[in-house]
Structures are given as C-alpha cells and as structure tokens.
Amino acid sequence: HDGFCLWPSEVASEVRGYPWDSMRTGPKRDLLGELFEACREEGVRPGLYYSFMEWESPLYSKSDKSEYVDRVMIPQIKDLIERYQPAVFWPDGEWDFPDTMWKSPEIVEWIYENAANPEEIVVNDRWGQGLRGQVGDYTTTEYDNLGNSSGKGMRKTRPFEECRGVGHSFAFNRAEGYDIYDSRTACVQRLIDLVSRGGVLLLDIG
C-alpha cells in the first residue's frame, strides 16, 4: 500500500513532489507494460491489483480524503484500464471507508461502460467497507480456504477466489522463517480443495 507505481504515472510523482513511478526512478521502465506484453505473448490474460489506501501519500494522510480520490485514485484507475486493458481489476485496501467515500459506484460504472474489453473484464468485491461478498463479479476470501468464517456461506451462491500468501504475510517478512511457508504438497492440496468446491486460488509469493 505504498502507492509506488510500476507504470508511468505522472500524478503519483506530481502529488508527492518527487519521482514515484518506475519510469522516473529506479529501472526507468514501464514494468507493468512489459509484464502484460509477456503474459499475452504466452496466452495468459493478466489482471491488475490496485490499492485504494496509500500509506504515505500527502493527500491520503488528510482527514478529508476526497482530494486524494479525485486527483490520484480515480485518474490512476482510469489510466490503468485504458492503457493495459486488464482481464481482472482487483482493488484492495477499501475496508476503512464506505464505497461512497471511494466513489466506487461511479468507478465500477465507468469501467463497465468504457473498458475496451467489456466482455472480458471482471472486478472483485473490494469496493467499500463491509461490502465483500455482496458486490462485484465474484467474492474474495483471504486465508480462509477451509471455510471457517463468513466466507463459507457466500461461496455457495457466488463464484469465489481464495487469496493468500505462501506464508503468513503478503510481502517480505523478516519474522517468518522457512518453516512458516507452505510446502509444495500443501499448496497443491489447497488448490485441489478449492477447485473441488468451485473456487480458484490466488497465491501470492511476495
């Protein structure tokens, strides 16, 4: 949720006042574009993750987040959809505020009306506080493949996707030893379990 952009995003650097995308600093490459091109060459339909929250943005740190939503979030989402035409749009970091604050209804409507691939693109259910399992094209559960929380009931009526890391974290965690990571056997067994119940597995390798 640090907001660093792996594609040429002028607004990210403009708002912060220093380079904050992969074209202006670091590799000076459109890493996202290169990944999408490589995926499509192999017949893989790529998706996009986008974090609503942005921990260190000077605009997100304000109590009134409307300027952040209008100046950063919405323009970036539209840019990503138009530029890369993802098959999946996967927002996250929505849980602290309602969908009206994020302007999610307007964003979803815009995506379905303006995406170059309207017959292909799907969106998940992470659009506002308390809405998981109720909106979007499918439900996302998290570290819940055994069905022992509220996600259990939703899976019976909606397509679902279980997302989790190979360890207990979605990113590098110095506190995790190798014994925390799932074995190959455990990963395969989890995948079989999910698919047998009509779900899919989104495995993060952080």
For the regions a language model picked out, list residue spans one by one.
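Mature catalytic domains of secreted/periplasmic carbohydrate-active enzymes
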Residues: 1-206
